[in-house]
Amino acid sequence: MHFIPKLFPAKLIRRYKRFLADVKQDDQHIFTVSVPNTGSMLGLTASNANIWLSYHENTKRKYAYQLEIVEADNTLVGINTTLPNKLVLEAIQNGLLPELSGYKTILKEQRYGTQSRIDFLLRDDNLPDCYLEVKNVHFIRQKGLAEFPDTETKRGARHLEELMHVVQQGKRAAMLYIIQREDCTAFTICHDLDPLYGRKFDLALKSGVECYAIKCHISVEGIFPIQRVKIENRRNND
């Protein structure tokens, strides 16, 4: 996925109210931008961090600039949580998810379960329906190990419960973790920051929910899914 138009460099001053950040450019001009991420962004909000912004000419937007990339630990990290669903389609088209190939129809944002929407519903006359839930990942504490979540997510735990019900009905269900940074070789669930999600994840795997993780190459030109990474179900004291 290419950034069109190109991104603009800036420095982060602070992030606040989840959806906002104050930033400054080289000319020291300070202004407010939108932040397309509802999570904690743990480890990505250091003052004076190098960041990159997209510009949107839509006059209905309150803030014309939007945060897209943060530099952390000498690595570019994508923070826009609306992008992984676009990157999933690229990953499937590029052969990174052969387990999900062969489906003729891919439906987005379909209602299922009791009160949820699935990111993707894959359908084909010759294959069982596959319900695919996608999560954005950017958190790293140990070198090379990406983790999710970086804070408690009751909604995420509910999604795992819904996927287990799908499997019980004889259909396929899968979790796909899109890692918007390149400096990782493995992925794990962050049990210590969200024990409930960790327990639900363990149950989901035992119930037959499939799980995949893909890391992306991040640059100011674009974000591209490039490689599967192994999944290690570690605990925080492992």
From Swiss-Prot:
GO MF annotations, alphabetized = DNA binding
List the coiled-coil residues. Answer: none
- Protein family: Belongs to the SfsA family.
List the PANTHER family: SUGAR FERMENTATION STIMULATION PROTEIN A
Q: What is this protein called?
A: Sugar fermentation stimulation protein homolog
Species the sequence originates in: Bartonella tribocorum (strain CIP 105476 / IBS 506)
